[in-house]
Structure formats: structure tokens, C-alpha cells
Regions:
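Bacterial N-terminal signal peptides that target proteins for export
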Residues: 1-9
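C-terminal motif of bacterial Sec signal peptides marking the signal peptidase cleavage site
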Residues: 18-22
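N-terminal secretory/targeting leader peptides
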Residues: 24-128, 147-342
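Hydrophobic helical h-region of N-terminal Sec-dependent signal peptides
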Residues: 9-17
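A gly/proline- and charged-residue-enriched helix-loop-helix capping module
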Residues: 129-144
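Residues in and immediately flanking transmembrane alpha helices
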Residues: 15-16, 139, 195
């Protein structure tokens, strides 16, 4: 059992205060425990900073939950990292201080080794392969359930696009261009190993530190989808985006299991359906918005985009694939994913 952090204590207090201010004198608003005597259950959804299509999808989830439960369950949001970064939000969901969060699969690696598979570079042949895997319940349900003993499980995924390198001082064409470069990566052992194999120097850090680190030359570049360029402003200092497309790491919505068990079967089913339907909404919204983001990055920041032959990148990171396909803990899952792309 993890020790309660100071952030958790502070967040619990703020949640209590926010809950009181949100409820006011309306006796129809209740916690799950009071649901048998009151009309509406309020469930709390906290999330870190996100692109607009993802925010819209999370709001659509709340709308669908309210609609499908005839208003008996409603979602209250704590946006933009008010309660902490992704690691803290997972812990808050685990403890029941909040009921839902949405985080990168990479952030879940330290809670379940199964999520590490998504950080394997070039795991998917293309976008079609990615969606085929993510929509396969035989593959995904065991991954979602892999954290059940920790008090939470996955509900659904959101598309977060492909991840490529973007740099301050010039484009990337081959792995040689990364040699000696300090590259920000997510706090993932697999992502760190990937950059090392490509010749770079990985610098693990949270997303909120990247802009100032690029600006101060603490790092030479980073890797992410195109939304960081205009929406997060990174294109103002890192103007070279190179499509090596090394990973497609999904976002995952997780839910506290103790809360789920207090809901009626009908309410639980409604939440599960709403989550899946919000995924369809998010995928469509993300695809539309990414093109707008690229155009704005070019127009407002002068970002240059270049295509890359990723063959030498794939060859360089082959040892990571060897590790996963030979490790007893991963080989069955790895094989199932590869079969979907055959």
C-alpha cells in the first residue's frame, strides 16, 4: 500500500471544499453512499492539461453519462492539473479521492507492466493496426483489468496520435542526427531505452517542464504529437518536426473500483457505454483538429515539417522488440498485437 502523499491530503481537502461549494443547499446532489436517499450521484473526474478534442471528448462522456442515467449520475470536472500531474491523478483515483482520470498509458507503466507494451517503438505498422488492437477486447480487457488489485481499472482509450521528434536546432533525418542530443522523454523505461538506442541522451521529465527546458537549452528537443507545437506553444522555440512516427501511445480513462461497486448495475452499464461512445467522438475530433494544429504551427510559429524514412530507426530499436517478444511476461501479448497487423 502506498503512503498518502501531501498532495493527496491537500487534494482531498480541496475536493471536499469544492464538493460543498458545488452542492450548495441542493439536497438532490449526493455522494454514492447517499444515493439511496437522494436523487443525483456526483462523480469526480480530474485530468491534467490536454488538447481541445480530448477535453471535448471528456465533456461528451459526462453528457452521455447524464443522458443514459436520466440524470441520476453526473460528472464534476477538475481540469488542467488542478489536482496534480498524471502520476498524482492516478494515485488520487486509486485512493478514491477522485473517481475518474485520463492519463497516458506510459504513466500507468509503474502500476502495471502490461501498459509498458505501448511504449515499444514501431509496435504498430500503421494507424489501422493501432485501432485494430485497441478495439480488440481480447487484447485490451486484460490490460484494463491488470490494475484491479490496486483499486482501479481501465474503461476505454483515447487516440493521442503518433509521436515524433521535434527539435530546436534542425530537423531529424536519420538516427545520426540524434547523436548526443538531449531529448525529453516521458517517464518510461522503454522510452528512455529507445532514445539511447537511437544515439540520443534521454531526459525524463513531466510535460509541464518541456517548454522552459527547450527555451533554456536544457534539452535540444522532445517527442510528442503535433498538438504540443501550437496549443502548448513548443513550436515557438522548437521549429523542426520530423515524422519518424516512433510510437502511438494511447490515453486511458481509469475508474476507481470501490465507487463502481456502489453504483447500480444500470448506472455502471451506462458509464461503460458512455466511455466507449466518447472514444468514437474523440477519435473523430482528434483527426480533424490535428490538421488545424499543423496549419497554425506553420502560420504562427514557422514550424517546418519533414517526412522521414523510418527504416533505420526501426533497425536501431530492434533490441527492444527482441526483449518484449522473448520475455515470458510480455511475449503472448506482443504476439497477439503483431498478429493484428499481419
Amino acid at each position: 500500500m502506498k503512503k498518502t502523499s501531501l498532495l493527496f491530503a491537500a487534494s482531498s481537502l480541496s475536493l471536499g471544499l469544492l464538493g460543498l461549494s458545488g452542492c450548495g443547499n441542493n439536497s438532490s446532489v449526493a455522494t454514492v453512499a447517499d444515493a439511496d436517499v437522494n436523487e443525483t450521484v456526483i462523480l469526480r473526474f480530474a485530468y491534467a492539461s490536454n488538447s481541445q478534442p480530448v477535453i471535448d471528448a471528456m465533456n461528451e462522456f459526462g453528457r452521455l453519462v447524464k443522458e443514459k442515467t436520466d440524470g441520476s449520475v453526473q460528472i464534476q470536472y477538475f481540469p488542467d492539473g488542478q489536482l496534480g500531474g498524471e502520476r498524482e491523478l492516478i494515485e488520487l483515483t486509486q485512493s478514491g479521492a477522485v473517481d475518474f482520470t485520463k492519463v497516458s498509458a506510459s504513466a500507468l507503466e509503474s502500476f502495471s507492466k502490461d501498459y509498458s507494451i505501448f511504449s515499444v517503438p514501431y509496435l504498430f505498422n500503421d494507424e489501422e493496426h493501432f485501432f485494430k488492437v485497441m478495439d480488440n477486447e481480447e487484447i485490451m480487457e486484460p490490460i484494463y483489468q491488470s490494475t484491479k488489485d490496486l483499486g482501479f481499472t481501465g474503461l476505454t482509450y483515447y487516440d493521442s496520435g503518433q509521436r515524433s521528434f521535434y527539435m530546436v536546432d534542425g530537423p531529424i533525418h536519420t538516427p545520426e542526427d540524434l547523436k548526443g542530443k538531449k531529448i525529453r522523454v516521458m517517464q518510461s523505461e522503454t522510452a528512455i531505452k529507445m532514445v539511447e538506442l537511437l544515439g540520443g541522451s534521454p531526459v525524463p521529465m513531466g510535460s509541464d517542464e518541456v517548454y522552459t527546458s527547450l527555451q533554456s537549452n536544457l534539452i535540444n528537443g522532445s517527442e510528442n504529437n503535433e498538438f504540443v507545437l501550437y496549443t502548448a506553444g513548443h513550436g515557438g522555440v522548437a521549429k523542426y518536426y520530423s515524422y519518424d512516427e516512433h510510437t502511438r501511445v494511447p490515453d486511458i480513462i481509469i475508474m476507481n473500483d470501490a465507487i463502481k461497486e456502489q453504483l447500480t448495475a444500470e448506472q455502471e452499464k451506462a458509464i461503460e457505454e458512455a466511455a466507449k461512445e466518447s472514444t468514437v467522438f474523440e477519435i473523430e475530433a482528434f483527426a480533424r483538429a490535428i490538421e488545424e494544429e499543423k496549419a497554425l504551427a506553420q502560420e504562427e510559429h514557422g514550424v517546418q515539417f519533414n517526412d522521414v524514412d523510418n527504416t533505420p530507426f526501426r533497425e536501431a530499436v530492434a533490441p527492444i522488440h527482441d526483449t518484449f517478444k522473448n520475455d515470458p511476461a510480455y511475449k503472448d501479448l506482443y504476439q497477439k498485437i503483431q498478429e493484428q497487423g499481419a
